[in-house]
């Protein structure tokens, strides 16, 4: 059955398929497949690569919509393959669940968070960020100051996913960790996406990759504007008895503030991500949650770029990659993943492309304007 399952996935378009037992994933909460399916005995990891040429145009700030469309299509393709694999397992008499790729965090199901419905959060944030006159703007400000603490209640900034597709991919032998914490494939580097099918079928595990394709170049850390990826501090992860090393990541809000688009420039001047936002993040992680609370309360009620990003972030988190329309998929960073091609030569070229790509400024109606090239997207 395992080979039939793999053939099915590859016939549907998967570039690689791997299998791991649930026992291999004992350890951290995000590795536990029983959260998704009680009685889980195996996981099936699916992989698709991203197009390197599209990524380079994105890194060079030549094409922004192209990457957004491409990444959305690849995620949806992965999920479609996962659903077909799950249907095959169910036809064989087993239970199976295809886990949504990314943005599927456990806090969304928490009682405190669900006291305010998704639809209400979205409508309220869209209204708060809309243009309004002086009187209505003052009312919005008062509402945010009073009700923001309640609306944020229940969010766990640890961002534990329903199931970690990265850990699943490593357990199933599809790749190994790079310094960034992204999973690297020998042929594609980090420009790969994963989905996972969890099942109570007992399937034979594939071998875990013994070595990592990462050679320690640290280009991922060099292109991290937020300081989320440490240059030297490291941590260990053990999967299936094999211990791997990657950087000791900083607080998740560092990544959110840059990768979600609130700020395109923090540590490194002269170039930016695709975000025109400019925020200086606190140096110490212990200050960053207070910084976020103050930032949110100060900007949520304004008709500005930051409030627009907040609205988009709520939309993305609630609807995920699968359900949201493509025009709401606003990638601004991902540089730590996209810089990491297969060879060091390619990574160096990607790094230089980023440095030469210039900065993004805010154009009319919150559109992006690329400085140096003069292009507006």
Where are the regions a protein language model picked out?
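C-terminal/domain-terminus segments
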Residues: 334, 338, 345-375
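Non-catalytic, usually N-terminal nucleic-acid engagement modules in DNA/RNA processing proteins
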Residues: 1-86, 90, 99-104, 113-121
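Short, glycine-/Ser/Thr-/acidic-enriched flexible segments
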Residues: 24, 49-51, 199, 204, ...
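Catalytic cores of enzyme domains
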Residues: 74-336, 342, 352-357
